[in-house]
Amino acid sequence: MDNLKKQVGIKAAEFVKSGMVVGLGTGSTAAYFVEELGRRIAEEQLEITGVTTSNVTSSQARALGIPLASIDEVDYVDLTVDGADEIDSSLNGIKGGGAALLMEKIVATYSKDYIWIVDESKLSENLGSFKIPVEVIPYGSQQVFKKFEAAGYAPTWRLNEENERLITDMHHFIIDLHISQIKEPEKLAEELDLMGGVVEHGLFNNMVKKVIVAGNEGVRIINK
């Protein structure tokens, strides 16, 4: 599995050219993309500026010598590459398994181009196999949780290693929703967008036009 993730990370790095502002995703697959950019900077004199989507990715990028800037310090992001937890046949996706969904969506929204890199196990006809993370402010979060319960979304709190509520890089909580067969992700996203206390959710609808997939038969590209 790690080899598949590495293959798509290296392939995605081929789309990066000198002079670009590049959004650096978060997660085990995106880490291989960041690693390959670090290699190209060291060995090929690639010149880029990175915009990161989490504290974890910031630490990795600095260790690799990748120059960084905040999303507020650049005019735009040329290309963002990130992983995804599940992708449906229309290239809608669920992200946020690494609890970085808010920063990931902000960077993706202000990117000219956006690519997901995954292994083929992340592809499905309809979303629903993976939990949907919802980032909420602490104040009133119990009320939000109860509303999700009443809606039948089987919510659970995202916990840390100490079995306490996980606190995101932006100092929020995460409630994971367990909904099977999401046939109308746009409708669900609109519902979540309008809910008081919800900061962001892990439904990334109509945001990518290119997905790089690694499988047993090699790497392929799905274009929308």
Swiss-Prot record:
Region forming the signal peptide: none
Active site: residue positions: E104 (proton acceptor)
InterPro entries linked: NagB/RpiA_transferase-like, Ribose-5P_isomerase, Ribose5P_isomerase_typA_subgr, Ribose5P_isomerase_type_A
Pathway(s) served: Carbohydrate degradation; pentose phosphate pathway; D-ribose 5-phosphate from D-ribulose 5-phosphate (non-oxidative stage): step 1/1
GO MF annotation: an example: ribose-5-phosphate isomerase activity
EC number(s) from the headed UniProt entry: 5.3.1.6
Gene Ontology terms describing biological process: pentose-phosphate shunt, non-oxidative branch
Protein keywords: Isomerase
NCBIfam families, per database record: PRK00702.1 (NF001924), rpiA (TIGR00021)
Subunit structure: Homodimer.
Family: Belongs to the ribose 5-phosphate isomerase family.
Known function: Catalyzes the reversible conversion of ribose-5-phosphate to ribulose 5-phosphate.
Full protein name: Ribose-5-phosphate isomerase A
Source organism per UniProt: Lactococcus lactis subsp. lactis (strain IL1403)
Gene name for this UniProt entry: rpiA
